[in-house]
Amino acid sequence: MRFLRFLKIFFTVIRFGLDEMMLSRVNDRRVRLLLRITTIGRKFDAPPGVRLRLALESLGPIFVKFGQVLSTRRDLLPVDIADELAKLQDQVPPFESAVAIRLVENALGAPVDVLFDDFERVPVASASIAQVHFATVKAGQHAGKAVAVKVLRPNMLPVIDSDLALLRDIAVWAERLWADGKRLKPREVVAEFDKYLHDELDLMREAANGSQLRRNFAGLDLLLVPEMYWEFCTPTVLVMERMVGVPISQVETLRAAGVDIPKLAREGVEIFFTQVFRDGFFHADMHPGNIQVSLDPAHFGRYIALDFGIIGALSDFDKNYLAQNFLAFFKRDYHRVATLHLESGWVPPTTRVEELESAIRAVCEPYFDRALKDISLGQVLMRLFSTSRRFNVEIQPQLVLLQKTMLNVEGLGRSLDPELDLWKTAKPYLERWMNEQIGLRGWYERLKIEAPQWSKTLPQLPRLIHHALAERHDNKRGANDDMIRQILLEQKRTNRLLQGLLLFGVAVGVGAVLARAFLALAYGG
């Protein structure tokens, strides 16, 4: 089976001339001679990117998804190929309704007619991983609720594992033979794709992502996220509240319904930056099919988010890196942008900051001939990632996912309102986040988080030091030196914390006394 699949891949490569694309960059002279022989009599009119896209489409949904993931790696691929791969559509015919019903019944342990009323046999959506049916809950606490039932395609895992094994083999050979193999890191790209696919195969994980996003936006009149009905959720079946809206791409329909389109564009950007800089947790598959607008009078004009299989997460370090980069960029402080890249640890330490600064200036300076509203933050990130190739910068997967999502958000926003000033909308979020992190409030919040742990550690330090010294004396192990250094470092950190707490307490006390004295003088008390 695997051999037959390999043969199909081989003949597809020959058919679309991908061997010419790949082998032309191989260093081995014998391979280049073989290329000259195999290309005799073959002529390809279509550009390389188009041929690659057509080849992936002919190999089936797993390779289509691989191409979609590759399209986000603009730090690795030429722009023309990345743009062409972005056109790949994850659309496949639905599987039989009888199979879907059997899968639901096996997963939930009861007949569909017992669980649901009006289970629609024809799916409303179908993709390579799953398809969706509408239904109504029959009994229990959610009786009468209209729901969407997402069902994982049957026998997906063996197919995926087989294709992934072949992709891993191809990646090994590409890295060994291709001139760009080491820089493009094909094995790492395949490993990233492996994780991405297996995450999508777990619908419980998707339900948890949706539940988290719903909780994050509770109380805000910005985004509607369906409720997950956990009693009906398993790794292969997901049941959630049914939300019906108009796809965001149908602008004329929305305008005719009375939706405020410029306001919708601004709120879309606001939703994105709230996810990124407030929550560090963002919907990373924001194409028009997954983003709709409610026309329900109770939630008129509000966004609806669907499909939570791909979610990005950012650490405080990532958010700080992004915020400072964007702020430095708009101040045209390229030295700061270069320094941030070096401080991140993702640039080789031998890199000269002046050389990196010069390259970043060459990328960014042309943008300032335009109005701020015409500057694409996603394009800025993309150009910076492209520059990173020259300096062997290690781009983090979560930032690549963010850049792809940012391009989607900008595209959606400007399709709604061509005059949308993304920077004007984003800047308050960046500045607010920086103030919260660097100011007194940020210091106090971190203090509250760390203080309990340090208060537990402090009383144990004398015993730990005594134990480490005794063990060192007995065993004379060099490894204990590291332990002692770590303990002493922890003690220094704890001392700094206690000093900070003391100073903070004194400052608060003095402030209270001065405030009381001022009030007494002011009011004669």
Curated annotation (Swiss-Prot):
It comes from the Bacteria. Residues 118-500 form the Protein kinase domain. The keyword Glycoprotein does not apply. It is found in: Cell inner membrane. The active site is at D285 (proton acceptor). The chain crosses the membrane at residues 501-521. GO terms for biological process: regulation of ubiquinone biosynthetic process; ubiquinone biosynthetic process. The keyword Transport does not apply. One of its GO terms (cellular component) is plasma membrane. InterPro entries: ABC1_dom, Kinase-like_dom_sf, UbiB, UbiB_bact, UbiB_kinase. It is a single-pass membrane protein. Its main location: membrane. Disulfide bonds: none annotated. ATP binds at V124, A125, S126, A127, S128, I129, A130, Q131, V132, K150. Keywords: ATP-binding, Cell inner membrane, Cell membrane, Kinase, Membrane, Nucleotide-binding, Transferase, Transmembrane, Transmembrane helix, Ubiquinone biosynthesis. Pathway: Cofactor biosynthesis; ubiquinone biosynthesis [regulation]. Its EC number is 2.7.-.-. One of its GO terms (molecular function) is protein kinase activity. NCBIfam families: PRK04750.1, UbiB. Is probably a protein kinase regulator of UbiI activity which is involved in aerobic coenzyme Q (ubiquinone) biosynthesis. Belongs to the ABC1 family. UbiB subfamily. This is Probable protein kinase UbiB. It comes from Paraburkholderia phytofirmans (strain DSM 17436 / LMG 22146 / PsJN).
